[in-house]
Design a protein with these regions (language model features):
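Extreme N-terminal starter segment of soluble prokaryotic enzymes
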Residues: 1-5
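Hydrophobic residues at beta-strand termini and immediately following loops
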Residues: 6, 55, 108, 130, ...
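Active-site catalytic loop in hydrolytic enzyme cores
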Residues: 60, 86-163, 167-168, 175-190, ...
Length: 249
């Protein structure tokens, strides 16, 4: 199965621009015959950006959701992407797995949001897997991978997932000197080995300009860990990239 990771630039508070970029990346992935394209966390409004209070929409029916569904359908490709969801008085940091006909196969709400981000997002309360032509796929979002005991990824493994897709927003402070990525290798490797599954995390690039991490930069460096816990591929640091990885399923 050919997986594309769309390490795209996200401009906080600019959902129209960001969704147009996402549509372009989906089309580019499909043109290279990828089976699934994975995009970043909160790609519409940007992670923790307060514009979501005005701009986020429902799932299904909101503009971000429906444009991603239309792109998947137009390109006949599976799409996994993170967007902000409005449900009643609550906002959720959400992710969708969308089938090539535009159908929503899986809808995940981030369970393990950082403390300061909970002023904006309500945490989710459930996990699921979706059955696809390549087997079961699970979805988590970024810091979901950090739950004590790596419980979320391990639970998805117990539920039969052979691939876990994780929209992310990996950010570093202005004085960060690198290297970056060991915390993700440490989080992805053990459950990947234990359950013989693949975990893919796709981060955006671009600034964080709201909340406690104002001034930080999202740096990409997206990562795919294989069933032996080794690295199947990693994208560049700090730049946009469309990375293609053959995933064993």
């Amino acid at each position: 199965m050919l997986l594309a990771l769309s390490q795209m630039h996200v401009e906080p508070g600019q959902p129209q621009l960001n969704l147009s970029r996402a549509e372009q990346r989906i089309a580019a992935a499909a043109a290279t015959l990828a089976d699934i394209v994975l995009l970043p966390e909160a790609l519409d409004c940007g992670w923790t950006h307060p514009s979501a209070r005005e701009l986020a929409g429902p799932i299904p029916g909101g503009e971000a959701c429906e444009r991603l569904r239309a792109a998947a359908r137009a390109c006949s490709i599976h799409v996994c992407a993170g967007i902000v969801e409005r449900s009643g008085d609550h906002l959720y940091n959400a992710a969708l797995l969308i089938g090539p006909g535009g159908e929503i196969l899986l809808h995940h709400r981030k369970l393990h949001e950082l403390d300061f981000a909970r002023a904006l997002y309500t945490c989710g309360d459930r996990l699921a897997v979706a059955r696809t032509p390549w087997g079961c796929i699970g979805v988590m979002i970024c810091a979901d991978a950090f739950v004590e005991g790596l419980g979320i990824s391990r639970t998805l493994g117990h539920m039969g997932a052979k691939l876990i897709l994780s929209p992310c927003a990996w950010a570093v402070p202005p004085d960060f000197a690198g290297p970056y990525g060991q915390l993700w290798r440490d989080s992805y490797g053990p459950p990947a080995r234990e359950f013989r599954l693949t975990i893919a995390g796709c981060s955006n690039t671009g600034p964080v300009n709201a909340g406690e991490w104002t001034g930080w930069q999202c740096i990409g460096h997206s990562l795919v860990t294989g069933p032996d816990g080794g690295i199947l591929g990693q994208a560049a640091y700090g730049v946009e990239q469309l990375l293609f990885i053959e995933v064993p399923m």
